[in-house]
């Protein structure tokens, strides 16, 4: 069977950036890595309803800077900033260094793979038909400006006895083009029949020279006249 490389991992350093940026050696590396995993798990648990897409962690000298990318910044900040201050205090105690929290708003959640996967999973948990959930998400993404999108669901779809995989795609999703900006993420829907996995690929355009370039449709080649 053909094996597929992770769409984000293969593009790191080309069109994708690392979500953890710091330097460590020896045992410190393992400690930092475990701390990052614990921080992300803690924030995702605390901010379940805040539509959090990504958490970036930077560690300059003896401090930590955490950037939370969310479609609902008001929920993260809380009334008069009380909630985000509580998060900062908890993370400072957990990481052992002063923590600064930045919040980045996602203005187009329809073009974010994690948020699209979460939306589809939540619909599946509410017993919405999987084809309707996938088609609605694909249409919304294409309407907002995606160049292409593919959604795949796997599991006991519709309560079937045998698990299967279904997918829906519109536009182009060039996984082998390294300069293609493809946002990929997964999420799980916990239904009464078991777990259904959701995968989302969103093609936003090609990155050339450090910036997005609009893809123009190619004109069809002129037909050659047959010799008489």
From Swiss-Prot:
Free-text function comment from the UniProt entry: Binds the lower part of the 30S subunit head. Binds mRNA in the 70S ribosome, positioning it for translation.
GO cellular component, one term: cytosolic small ribosomal subunit
SMART domains listed in its UniProt record: KH
Gene3D superfamilies (alphabetical): 3.30.300.20, Ribosomal protein S3, C-terminal domain (3.30.1140.32)
Protein name (Swiss-Prot/TrEMBL): Small ribosomal subunit protein uS3
Sorted UniProt keywords: Ribonucleoprotein, Ribosomal protein, RNA-binding, rRNA-binding
GO MF entry, a single one: mRNA binding
Organism: Stutzerimonas stutzeri (strain A1501)
Protein's GO biological process: translation
Assembly information from the UniProt record: Part of the 30S ribosomal subunit. Forms a tight complex with proteins S10 and S14.
């Amino acid at each position: 069977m053909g094996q597929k490389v992770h769409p984000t991992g293969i593009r790191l350093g080309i069109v994708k950036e690392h979500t953890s940026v710091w330097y460590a050696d020896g045992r410190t590396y393992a400690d930092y890595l475990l701390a990052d995993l614990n921080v992300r798990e803690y924030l995702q648990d605390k901010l379940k309803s805040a539509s959090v897409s990504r958490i970036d962690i930077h560690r300059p000298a003896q401090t930590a800077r955490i950037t939370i990318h969310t479609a609902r910044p008001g929920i993260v900040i809380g009334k008069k900033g009380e909630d985000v201050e509580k998060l900062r205090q908890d993370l400072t105690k957990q990481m052992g260094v002063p923590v600064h929290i930045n919040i980045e708003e996602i203005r187009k959640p329809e073009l974010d793979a994690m948020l699209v996967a979460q939306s589809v999973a939540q619909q599946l948990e509410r017993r919405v038909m999987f084809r309707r959930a996938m088609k609605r998400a694909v249409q919304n993404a294409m309407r907002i400006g995606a160049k292409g999108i593919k959604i795949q669901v796997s599991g006991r779809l519709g309560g079937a006895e045998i698990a299967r995989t279904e997918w829906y795609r519109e536009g182009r999703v060039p996984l082998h083009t390294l300069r293609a900006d493809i946002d990929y993420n997964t999420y799980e829907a916990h239904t009464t029949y078991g777990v259904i996995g959701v995968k989302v690929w969103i093609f936003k355009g090609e990155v050339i020279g450090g910036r997005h370039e609009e893809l123009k449709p190619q004109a069809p080649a002129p037909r050659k006249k047959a010799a008489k």
